[in-house]
Amino acid sequence: MPAAKVCVLLLALVGTGLLSACGGTGPNFVAKDEPWREAEERSCVASGVVHETAFIRSRSALGGPSVCGAEHPFEMSAADGGRIRLKPAALLRCPMIPQVDRWISTVVAPAAIHAYGVPLAEITVAASYGCRPMNNVSGAMLSEHGHANALDVSGFILADGTRITVKKGWKGDVRERTFLRRVHDGACEEFTTVLGPNYDSNHRDHFHVDLARRGKTGLNRVCK
C-alpha cells in the first residue's frame, strides 16, 4: 500500500484489540474497538431519557476517521430546563446529556448560590466532540472526546455578569475557590472521569468530565 494511504494495523491479531493508524494523513491516535459504546448509546436513545427540546436537538450521526463518532448525537445548548446556557453548544452522545444536565442543575447552580448568592446563567464550553488523541498528543489513545463522550468546561457566568474561570479562579479568592471546588467535587458523583487543575498542566484551565468505562466492571472512577 502506498505510504500516502491510510495504513491500519490490526493489533487485535496479537490480542490487544487496538487499532492504530500509520502513515500519511491517517488518524494520529491509537483506538480500541469497544462494542459496549454502540449498545449503550442505542439503549439510551430507546429509553427516551433524552428527548428533543428547544435546547436539546438531535443531530446527524458522527463518523470517522477510525472509531470516532456517535450514532445518535445531540446538540445541547442549555441545561436545567433551558435556564442555564451552554456556549458554544455541546455535541454529545445520548448518555452524557442527562449526566451533564444533572451536574449543572444539582451541583453547579447551587454552588453559585452558595458562593455568590447569584444564579448561574451560562457555562463556557471549551470542548465536546472532537476526533483527536488524549491531550492532543500524537500517537496517544483516542480521547473520549472522539466518542462525543466528554465535555470540557472552562468557565461560568452568573446572572449579574460575574465571570469565574477555572484558570484564574482555581487559586483565586475565597469565593472562586469555594465555588470551583464544589463544582469539581460534585462532578465526581456524576461522571466516571473528572480531571482538573490538580491533575496536570493540560487541565490547568478547564474541568474535563466523561463517562468512560474503567476496570473490569466499567465502574471504576477517576477524580483528580
Residue ranges of predicted features:
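Bacterial Sec signal peptide processing site at the extreme N-terminus
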Residues: 16-40
